């Protein structure tokens, strides 16, 4: 870890983008800045100009090219000079932190001596220099410039440093004698990044020396001398100073040189051959000679040669990692060299023995059971009585369950015949590989061939170990491979070859293997859609990703990263095809898992290898002895148990081959890459080679890449591909050029791969649920958790700081502990950014005043708290290995005896010990734990954790095998899967396989013609693999699910080949791989320029155009082609749906337009049209479809008729077999669905009816003639529905707008391609792409060119489609905040929004149904209205803010877009939602009616003053208590109907006097006769509106106008004062004011700005009635404000009583109580009311009218008793506006009534209601017309319409006043009512429907109830009969007839498509309420239209 976490401390924002920390250290940039090269980019040019002017001003330098800019030499020189002048005393900060240092060592059981014991003088110079430079760096980034004139200079000793424009100037202080920069007065110049790298190099050296110093005291043998480190550094500086940049190539060889020395020390064990050593040293010498620095090199080599200890020498690794280290030996390679040993997979000897036996058993079973070539068994080792021997001699497999069977005995069975298989054979096949075959003699005679000598040496290294000459090898190989007998068995291996780690299946059991295969096939399919997600997160892939991503950077504009992933043809062929095949394929056949084992190195990870050719296996005694010896010594079990048994073979034989090849390959690739002179990185493992190249490019200001640059990069990329190809050819490796992917060619959703955000998160989430990565089988928890995370977060965010941190964490988890300290040529790189720390540093900023250039000299080390933290970082990291590979503690390790790999293991052991010791500073402990990802739950997991250096995350106790054994079955059976997505996924998988099974079940023979066709269109490579995998998966799954352990292998193999064969039928051709012709950038530019014209690139239609269709006569096709006006919709089912969805969403199907199908198409249609037999058959078949669905047995009859009509032999049709199977098996429907064979030209007629919808299409284009017929059928059926008979032509529906044509249609009609943006991406459907692009917002930068109105329109469209929050969007488009801007052009905004909504609706249809169905404007309008209502909350979120602003509202109202002006702003949520919905509906209607362009629609506007007059003025207490301001009442109109404009002011006052309003009620007297009981507690009513006291009561309902009608007659007195409590705006007072126009009135109503409008669209009384009717009679404007009418407050009650007393004390007062409980406890409210009434009773003659509504009679009585003020009798007043579903009535308590203490009993109340019901029924029987209201004047019609429409709205039907015309209303209800039922989606797009299209399950009782009500209305409207007996209405059946249409109640049609009946009679009361409200319709449509 870097001692100072620079990236944390340094903010990069102040640096120009071109010179950020991550700029490449190249000459090019500084050369461009300093005039030695022409600047390549505009940015660099501008930067250079600024630099020039600075130099002219301060240094009088005209020509920058005179300056010294060789940073390599300069920094080497500076380091030398500055180190010499440093003080030898180390700065105190290190020593101050001695304590954590000591406790750290204590935790390792090690005591540090006192600090005085150390000699610091070696460490001091670098340490102090670093401290100074770091201080300069931090200061330079803190200072804030205030003036352009100010300069900041920093000094480090005599050196002056200045930062200008991303470059650093170095010059010597004039007073100083030394000239550090060697260029006199002139400064030297380097890029900022070079300066940073220099500092990081110094920092690294400081640490190294400090470590060395500490180690010299604590453990001499561990570390090199500090002197030798310093000497190396000094020599290197000297070399660099002399040779400059080229010398870095020499430093690249530093590690190989160290390796050569190590090899000498460790001897041959280390595996380095002499010639290899000489090569490396030779290379170095040659290079040094060329650079004239041989002496420097020799001095370095001397220092190396002085090191005679392996341990200190090992610490020299990594000293120069920060130079561009060429990966010739990548870090991984070195680790592989070190991995010379590892622990065995199982430590327990018994487990070992068991595994061992299992393996032998696998081999032997294979021999005995399957083939005659089984070797002889030597059973002499077994005792004659052995059960095993007995069974083997009889040639049987022993029965494991037998009590006699002993697992151990297997171990001692021996082969007698076997094949030798040493590694050299592998090489011999290498040597016979095609590269060498060209020139074999040359090899044998030790001549030369096309291969590099270096590669040859590497090969020879292996050969020498086994053979004396190459000729021997070839001879041996031929002998082996020509001998048929012995080709099969055992392995002969040497210990040395078993040490390289590989990865693979280990001892996976069947279940996980099975899961694996299935997963891979799923992933294979998904990969095409989501390439990044499906990459598996194996070790290798993590490496790949880490590699590719770590080379990227977010703040480097001007560079493009091109990643190439090489795909080499038949790499390792030799391993796969020759040697490994013998063993692996036998294993594969044994297990029926064909491709699994046969891949390279996949079996060896966990196995123990048995060498059959060895001497006898150890006897039991020998075995036990070894075991005991090890146990006694406390050793782990050894790798080699006996002669011929090995564990720990990690990747084994193949691993070695691969290792050799990897190196060969690397040398080749590196050679090609060096020629390009571009910065590049290579990662290689085996044939996986990834190259990252960084290419500088010129970019536009907005970040786009110009066309010519793109072309240049592509050309460059291709050149590299070609040169790689020819270079690799020399090694006999052929590159598959077309599959060598470059990020330039890969685009996902049209974005280039090197854009960071490829996919939206949502898609990722969905995808990760669908993919189970193939590496997640390790254990079940991983497997499940992998689903949630995948790596989506990683790919989403590695381009930002947070992402990098996350990435770091993931890498840590994957065991890449050195990531945090990864050094590259740039120095250090960190994945972490901690904002808090950055903030802390930035907080202490200095400010400079004007004036002189200021010089800041910084003291040698400022004391900062930071030191402790850094030290802790350093210590914690050294626990896991510091950057140097140094250890700060002793290693009692004998390197000669064990491999270097143990060294690492040993370190981890020590780390573990330290962690468990408890001495460790907790902060260090935490750091280490987080680096290792130790689970917090348990510290004891440490032992597992540190087992293997490669995977620090094995934090689970059980090993994979155990977990899988335990849980695989469960997973397969879907138990214990909590993850819903996963469950669904596995279900889906099962379903898919089941479907395939069923479809393939009967295919015993394959039609040869079909077979031929298939073969010609199969893509060999892919399908071979896929078919095989699939077949294996099927077979395995059968096994797993049946638990059939006894299944013989022969049957298995047979099953598999059968699966393979049948599956072949289904293979089809993939569409060819295409790329986007036109880059996304271009597409977006085209789109942006075309905004407002509704086109993209000149061709995209607007949604309105795209919806228009025309009908065409199919016979005229040929003629119409030339007119460019005809097309066919060819939306197909998408692949991968389940049958249900496919059946529902199949669109129109049209054939594949290829040359062969054209004639077929015409033929099919002509046949359909002209041939009466065909017509008849088609008609029959379509009938048959519905019959089959309903399971009718008429089916056979119909088939007969069909065969007669079509003249074909029914027996030849596959459908017949389906019939038989169905009858025998699963019932008709299931059978037919399950076993129909694929659609093909021979049998399409049969399949027409019911199969195609179930077809699983293998690709989106698997279409043939059958689909055509389907299209015909659909049209035919539609035709039949309309015309009832077949005649004339079948019309084809087609798009009018030619720009809507798709590619295939254009080909078919020979329409030339015009310039347009083509989407040829395989991954997305063209229509969808069109939608998304059309709706995408253009870049903001393009907006200023538009006029503001179109910009606003555009914004509206975006609002509707983009779903972000409104505030965001507004600020996105207008730079000013919303408040200052107000809202521009709200009308345009809304119309744009409307357009967007229409489009959004179409798009949603497209997404849901896989097709965009073209629908007429009329039906579209209805569907949109429905759609808007369904999504109304969303609209409120999007455009709600318009309604918070009065000006916008007036503008909208003036244009007729907004229905009303609410009386208060801000609105409540409910008001807002409703308003937005209506406004949106209105906007869409406008757009549809004007075909998308909007014309302002003047609607009669209202006068400003009227609106003002009617604004609500909220009155405060002061107003009530005597402020004489005039008072305005509210203007309110809050209905949900969209075309009610604001109320006109001319309202005749006498309207309310009109007869129409006079409604008589029923009066019933209730007398108190029951003895009073003690107070019963109040039950809280469950129907109260809301328990939130903040919500104030509803506005006046229309209802209250009506239910109080006629009460005045019942009261029969003229009061002196009217008091209204509750009741919203007091509408309840209006009927009283009709009678008593002069009575003064007091309002104590809930009357307030925030007053809420009820959700169901209740109307509010026209305010003029209130204004004109009541204002003059207000008593001193006595209106109590809302909070005062809360009469649960005693003060409010007192105030009310005071007002009454003051005005009419002692007079007659009528009180109207309309209070609804809004959340106060019931008892409190009732007692407060009682208290109020009783007190009022004392001050005046009080008559009170109460609205009482309760759900039970008991509660009704209780309520009446609480308000009757001890009167003996009260009067109930009921009229038909009261609800009948609850006990609701007005209770009149008269003042003059006699008093009595009795109570009114429940029985009395119940009788009263019964009397009311009887009275109603008598009235109803008298005459139905008596109930009708006379025709109303228009004004009241409007009022009532609000009431009626709100009831309809409750039934999901939105009506406008235009619909209030008898015929239209009938039509609307008939047509739309069936839509309330959940028909299947077919109904959405087609006018026909079948009985079977109604899902019975989806119909709730509510929906049926709604249907009944609507049906009742229909009857009333059509025949004038308005039934009032709710009981009988509810019991009736509703019918739906063809169309589908609703029938009037009681009418039964001839053709019933559906009928519904309520299941329960509970809805009677609801019906009373609904119907009494709907009865008002009678007033609109009286009999005979009077």
Swiss-Prot record:
This enzyme's EC code(s): 2.7.7.48, 3.6.1.-, 2.7.7.88, 2.1.1.375
Superkingdom as given in the UniProt entry: Viruses
Annotated keywords: ATP-binding, Host cytoplasm, Hydrolase, Methyltransferase, mRNA capping, mRNA processing, Multifunctional enzyme, Nucleotide-binding, Nucleotidyltransferase, RNA-directed RNA polymerase, S-adenosyl-L-methionine, Transferase, Viral RNA replication, Virion
Where is this gene product found? Answer: Virion; Host cytoplasm
Q: Name one GO molecular function term.
A: GTPase activity
Q: Which cysteines are joined by disulfide bonds?
A: none
User: Mind telling me which GO cellular component terms the entry cites?
Assistant: host cell cytoplasm; virion component
Stretches assigned to the Mononegavirus-type SAM-dependent 2'-O-MTase domain: 1592-1788
Reactions performed catalytically: RNA(n) + a ribonucleoside 5'-triphosphate = RNA(n+1) + diphosphate; a 5'-end (5'-triphosphoguanosine)-adenylyl-adenylyl-cytidylyl-adenosine in mRNA + 2 S-adenosyl-L-methionine = a 5'-end (N(7)-methyl 5'-triphosphoguanosine)-(2'-O-methyladenylyl)-adenylyl-cytidylyl-adenosine in mRNA + 2 S-adenosyl-L-homocysteine + H(+); a 5'-end (5'-triphosphoguanosine)-adenylyl-adenylyl-cytidylyl-adenosine in mRNA + S-adenosyl-L-methionine = a 5'-end (5'-triphosphoguanosine)-(2'-O-methyladenylyl)-adenylyl-cytidylyl-adenosine in mRNA + S-adenosyl-L-homocysteine + H(+); a 5'-end triphospho-adenylyl-adenylyl-cytidylyl-adenosine in mRNA + GDP + H(+) = a 5'-end (5'-triphosphoguanosine)-adenylyl-adenylyl-cytidylyl-adenosine in mRNA + diphosphate
Tell me one Pfam family matched here: Mononeg_RNA_pol
> RdRp catalytic domain spans which residues?
560-757
- Record-listed ATP binding positions: 1619-1628
Q: Which InterPro entries match?
A: Mononeg_mRNAcap, Mononeg_RNA_pol_cat, Mononega_L_MeTrfase
Q: What is its main location?
A: virion
Q: Which family does it belong to?
A: Belongs to the rhabdoviridae protein L family.
What is the documented function of this protein? Answer: RNA-directed RNA polymerase that catalyzes the transcription of viral mRNAs, their capping and polyadenylation. The template is composed of the viral RNA tightly encapsidated by the nucleoprotein (N). The viral polymerase binds to the genomic RNA at the 3' leader promoter, and transcribes subsequently all viral mRNAs with a decreasing efficiency. The first gene is the most transcribed, and the last the least transcribed. The viral phosphoprotein acts as a processivity factor. Capping is concomitant with initiation of mRNA transcription.
Tell me, how does this one assemble?
May form homodimer. Interacts with the P protein.
Its protein name is RNA-directed RNA polymerase L
Q: Which organism is it from?
A: Infectious hematopoietic necrosis virus (strain Oregon69)
Q: Recall the taxonomic lineage recorded for the source organism.
A: Viruses, Riboviria, Orthornavirae, Negarnaviricota, Haploviricotina
């Amino acid at each position: 870890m870097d001692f100072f976490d620079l990236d944390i401390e340094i903010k990069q924002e102040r640096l120009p983008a071109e010179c950020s920390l991550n700029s490449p250290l190249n000459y090019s940039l500084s050369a461009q800045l300093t005039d030695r090269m022409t600047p390549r980019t505009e940015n660099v040019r501008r930067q250079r100009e600024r630099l020039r002017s600075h130099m002219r001003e301060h240094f009088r330098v005209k020509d920058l090219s005179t300056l010294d800019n060789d940073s390599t030499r300069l920094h080497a020189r500076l380091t030398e000079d500055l180190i010499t002048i440093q003080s030898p005393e180390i700065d105190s900060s290190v020593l101050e932190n001695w304590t954590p240092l000591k406790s750290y060592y204590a935790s390792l059981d090690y005591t540090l001596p006192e600090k005085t014991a150390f000699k610091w003088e070696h460490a001091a110079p670098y340490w102090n220099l670093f401290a100074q430079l770091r201080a300069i760096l931090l200061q330079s980034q803190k200072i804030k410039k205030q003036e352009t004139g100010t300069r900041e200079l920093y000094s480090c000793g005599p050196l002056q440093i200045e930062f200008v424009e991303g470059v650093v100037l170095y010059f010597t202080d004039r007073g100083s004698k030394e000239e550090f920069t060697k260029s006199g007065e002139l400064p030297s110049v380097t890029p900022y990044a070079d300066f940073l790298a220099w500092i990081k190099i110094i920092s690294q050296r400081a640490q190294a020396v400090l470590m060395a110093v500490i180690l010299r005291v604590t453990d001499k043998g561990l570390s090199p001398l500090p002197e030798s480190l310093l000497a190396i550094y000094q020599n290197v500086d000297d070399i660099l100073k002399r040779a400059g940049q080229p010398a870095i190539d020499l430093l690249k060889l530093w590690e190989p040189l160290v390796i050569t020395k190590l090899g000498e020390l460790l001897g041959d064990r280390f595996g380095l051959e002499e010639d290899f050593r000489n090569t490396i040293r030779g290379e170095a010498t040659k290079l040094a000679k060329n650079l004239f620095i041989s002496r420097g090199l020799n001095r370095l080599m001397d220092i190396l040669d002085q090191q005679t200890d392996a341990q200190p020498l090992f610490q020299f690794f990594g000293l120069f990692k920060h130079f561009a280290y060429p990966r010739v030996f990548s870090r991984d390679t070195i680790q592989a060299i070190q991995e010379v040993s590892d622990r065995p997979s199982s430590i327990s000897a018994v487990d070992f023995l068991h595994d061992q036996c299992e393996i032998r058993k696998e081999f032997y079973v294979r021999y005995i059971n399957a083939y005659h070539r089984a070797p002889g068994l030597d059973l002499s080792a077994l005792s004659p009585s052995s059960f095993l021997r007995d069974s083997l001699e009889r040639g049987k497999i022993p029965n494991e369950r037998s009590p006699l069977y002993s697992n151990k005995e297997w171990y001692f069975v021996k082969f007698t015949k076997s094949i030798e298989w040493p590694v050299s054979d592998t090489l011999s096949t290498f040597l016979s590989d095609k590269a060498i075959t060209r020139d074999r003699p040359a090899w044998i005679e030790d001549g030369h061939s096309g291969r590099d000598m270096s590669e040859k040496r590497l090969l020879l290294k292996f050969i020498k170990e086994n053979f004396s000459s190459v000729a021997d090898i070839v001879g041996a190989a031929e002998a082996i491979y020509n001998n048929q007998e012995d080709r099969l068995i055992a392995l002969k291996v040497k210990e040395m070859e078993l040490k390289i780690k590989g990865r693979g299946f280990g001892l996976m059991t069947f279940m996980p293997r099975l899961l694996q295969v299935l997963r891979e096939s799923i992933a294979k399919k998904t990969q095409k859609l989501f390439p990044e997600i499906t990459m598996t997160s194996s070790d290798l892939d993590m490496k790949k990703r880490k590699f590719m991503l770590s080379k990227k950077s977010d703040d480097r504009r001007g560079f493009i990263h091109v990643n190439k992933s090489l795909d080499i043809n038949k790499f390792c062929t030799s391993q796969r095809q020759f040697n490994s095949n013998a063993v692996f394929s036998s294993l594969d056949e044994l297990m029926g898992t064909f491709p699994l084992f046969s891949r390279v190195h996949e079996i060896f990870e966990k196995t123990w290898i048995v060498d059959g050719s060895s001497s006898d296996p150890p006897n039991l005694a020998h075995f036990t002895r070894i075991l005991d010896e090890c146990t006694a010594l406390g050793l782990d079990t050894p790798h080699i148990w006996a002669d011929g048994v090995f564990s720990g073979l990690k990747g084994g034989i193949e691993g070695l081959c691969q290792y050799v090849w990897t190196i060969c390959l690397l040398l080749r690739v590196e050679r090609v890459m060096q020629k390009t002179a571009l910065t590049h990185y290579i990662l290689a493992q085996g044939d996986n080679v990834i190259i990252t190249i960084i290419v500088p490019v010129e970019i536009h200001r907005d970040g786009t890449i110009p066309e010519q640059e793109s072309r240049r990069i592509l050309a460059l990329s291709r050149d590299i591909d070609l040169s790689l190809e020819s270079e690799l050819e020399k090694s006999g490796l052929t590159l598959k050029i077309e599959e060598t992917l470059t990020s330039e060619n890969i685009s996902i959703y049209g974005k280039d791969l090197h854009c960071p955000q490829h996919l939206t998160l949502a898609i990722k989430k969905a995808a990760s649920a669908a993919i189970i990565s193939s590496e997640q089988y390790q254990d079940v928890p991983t497997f499940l958790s992998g689903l949630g995370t995948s790596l989506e977060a990683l790919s989403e965010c590695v381009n930002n700081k947070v992402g990098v941190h996350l990435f770091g964490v993931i890498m840590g988890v994957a065991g890449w502990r050195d990531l945090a300290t990864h050094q590259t040529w740039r120095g250090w790189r960190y994945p972490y950014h901690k904002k808090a720390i950055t903030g802390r540093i930035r907080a202490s900023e200095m400010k400079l005043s004007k004036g002189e250039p200021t010089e800041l000299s910084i003291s040698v080390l400022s004391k900062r708290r930071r030191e402790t933290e850094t030290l802790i970082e350093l210590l914690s990291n050294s626990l896991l290995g510091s950057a140097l590979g140094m250890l700060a503690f002793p290693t009692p390790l004998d390197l000669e005896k064990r491999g270097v790999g143990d060294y690492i293991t040993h370190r981890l052991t020590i780390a573990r010990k330290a962690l468990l010791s408890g001495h460790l500073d907790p902060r260090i402990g935490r750091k280490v734990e987080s680096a290792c990802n130790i689970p917090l739950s348990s510290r004891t997991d440490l032992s597992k954790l540190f087992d293997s250096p490669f995977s620090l995350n094995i934090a689970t106790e059980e090993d994979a095998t155990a977990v899988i054994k335990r849980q695989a079955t469960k997973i397969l059976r879907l138990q214990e899967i909590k993850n819903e997505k996963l469950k669904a996924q596995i279900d889906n998988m099962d379903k898919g396989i089941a479907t395939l099974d069923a479809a393939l079940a009967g295919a015993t023979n394959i039609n040869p013609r079909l077979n031929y066709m298939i073969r010609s269109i199969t893509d060999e490579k892919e399908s071979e693999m896929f078919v095989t995998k699939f077949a294996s998966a099927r077979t395995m799954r059968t096994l797993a699910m049946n638990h059939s352990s006894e299944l013989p292998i022969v049957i298995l193999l047979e099953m598999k080949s059968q699966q393979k064969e049948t599956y072949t039928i289904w293979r089809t051709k993939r569409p060819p791989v295409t790329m986007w012709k036109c880059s996304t950038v271009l597409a977006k530019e085209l789109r942006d320029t075309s905004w407002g014209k509704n086109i993209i690139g000149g061709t995209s239609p607007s949604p309105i155009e795209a919806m228009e269709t025309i009908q065409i006569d199919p016979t005229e096709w040929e003629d119409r082609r030339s007119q460019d006006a005809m097309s066919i919709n060819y939306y197909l089912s998408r692949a991968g749906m389940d049958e249900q969805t496919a059946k529902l969403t199949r669109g129109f199907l049209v054939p594949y337009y290829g040359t062969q199908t054209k004639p077929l198409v015409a033929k099919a249609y002509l046949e359909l049209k002209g041939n009466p037999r065909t017509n008849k058959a088609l008609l029959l078949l379509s009938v048959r479809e519905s019959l089959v669905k309903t399971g009718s047995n008429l089916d056979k009859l119909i088939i007969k008729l069909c065969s007669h009509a079509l003249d074909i032999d029914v027996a030849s049709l596959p459908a017949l077999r389906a019939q038989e199977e169905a009858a025998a098996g699963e019932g008709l429907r299931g059978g037919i669905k399950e076993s129909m064979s694929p659609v093909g030209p021979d049998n399409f007629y049969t399949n027409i009816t019911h199969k195609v919808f179930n077809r699983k299409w293998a690709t989106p284009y698997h279409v043939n003639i059958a689909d055509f017929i389907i299209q015909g059928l659909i049209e035919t059926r539609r035709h039949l529905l309309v015309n009832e008979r077949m005649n004339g032509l079948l019309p084809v529906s087609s798009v009018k707008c030619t720009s809507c044509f798709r590619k295939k249609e254009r080909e078919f009609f020979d329409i030339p391609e015009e310039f347009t943006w083509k989407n040829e991406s395989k991954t997305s459907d063209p229509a969808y792409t069109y939608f998304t692009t059309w709706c995408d917002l253009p870049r903001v930068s393009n907006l200023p060119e538009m006029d503001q109105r179109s910009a606003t329109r555009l914004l509206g469209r975006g609002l509707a489609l983009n779903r972000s929050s409104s505030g965001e969007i507004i600020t996105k488009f207008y730079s000013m905040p919303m408040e200052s801007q107000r809202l521009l052009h709200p009308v345009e905004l809304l119309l744009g929004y409307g357009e967007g909504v229409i489009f959004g609706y179409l798009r949603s249809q497209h997404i849901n149904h896989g097709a965009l169905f073209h629908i007429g404007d009329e039906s579209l309008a209805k569907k949109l209205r429905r759609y808007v209502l369904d999504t109304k909350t969303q609209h409120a979120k999007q455009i709600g803010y318009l309604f918070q602003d009065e000006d916008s509202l007036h503008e909208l109202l003036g244009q007729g877009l907004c229905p009303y002006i609410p009386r208060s702003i801000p609105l409540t949520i409910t008001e807002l939602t409703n308003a937005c919905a209506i406004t949106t509906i209105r906007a869409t209607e406008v757009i549809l009616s004007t075909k998308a362009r909007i014309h302002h629609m003047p609607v009669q506007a209202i006068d400003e003053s009227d609106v003002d007059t009617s604004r609500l003025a909220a009155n405060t207490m002061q107003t009530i208590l005597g402020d004489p301001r005039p008072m305005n009442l509210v203007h309110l109109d809050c209905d949900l109907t969209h075309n009610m404009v604001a109320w006109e002011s001319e309202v005749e006052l006498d309207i309310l006097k009109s007869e129409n309003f006079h409604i008589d009620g029923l009066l019933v007297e209730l007398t108190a006769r029951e003895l009073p009981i003690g107070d019963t507690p109040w039950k809280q009513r469950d129907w109260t509106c809301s328990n939130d006291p903040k919500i104030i009561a509803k506005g006046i309902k229309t209802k209250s106008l009506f239910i109080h009608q006629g009460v005045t007659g019942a009261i029969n007195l003229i009061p002196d004062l009217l008091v209204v409590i509750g009741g919203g705006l007091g509408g309840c007072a209006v009927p009283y004011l009709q009678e008593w126009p002069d009575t003064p009135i007091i309002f104590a109503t809930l009357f307030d700005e925030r007053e809420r409008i009820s959700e169901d669209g209740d109307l509010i009384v026209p305010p003029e009635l209130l204004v004109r009717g009541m204002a003059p009679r207000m008593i001193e404007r006595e209106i109590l404000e809302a909070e005062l009418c809360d009469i649960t407050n005693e003060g409010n009650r007192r105030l009310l009583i005071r007002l009454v007393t003051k005005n009419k004390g002692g007079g007659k007062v009528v009180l109207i109580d309309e209070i609804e409980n809004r959340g106060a406890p019931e008892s409190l409210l009732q007692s407060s009311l009682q208290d109020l009434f009783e007190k009022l009773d004392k001050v005046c003659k009080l008559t009170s009218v109460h609205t009482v509504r309760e759900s039970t009679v008991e509660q009704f009585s209780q309520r009446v008793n609480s308000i009757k003020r001890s009167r003996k009798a009260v009067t109930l007043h009921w009229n038909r506006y009261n609800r009948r579903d609850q006990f609701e009535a007005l209770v009149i308590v008269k003042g003059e009534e006699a008093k009595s203490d009795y109570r009114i009993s429940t029985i009395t109340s119940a009788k009263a209601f019964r009397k009311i019901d009887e009275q109603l029924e008598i009235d109803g029987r008298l005459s139905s017309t008596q109930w009708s209201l006379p025709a109303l004047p228009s004004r009241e019609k409007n009022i009532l319409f609000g009431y009626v429409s709100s009831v309809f709205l409750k039934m999901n039907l939105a009506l406008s006043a235009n619909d209030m015309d008898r015929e239209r209303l009938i039509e609307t209800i008939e047509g739309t009512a069936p839509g309330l039922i959940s028909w299947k989606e077919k109904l959405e797009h087609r006018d026909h429907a079948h009985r079977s299209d109604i899902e019975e399950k989806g119909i709730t009782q509510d929906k049926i109830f709604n249907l009944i009500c609507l049906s009742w209305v229909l009857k009333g409207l059509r025949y004038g009969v308005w039934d009032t007996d709710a009981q009988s209405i509810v019991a009736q059946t509703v019918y739906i007839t063809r169309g589908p249409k609703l029938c009037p109640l009681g009418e039964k049609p001839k053709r019933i498509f559906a009928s519904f009946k309520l299941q329960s009679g509970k809805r009677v009361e609801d019906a009373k309420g609904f119907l009494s409200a709907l009865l008002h319709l009678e007033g609109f449509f009286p009999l005979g239209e009077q």
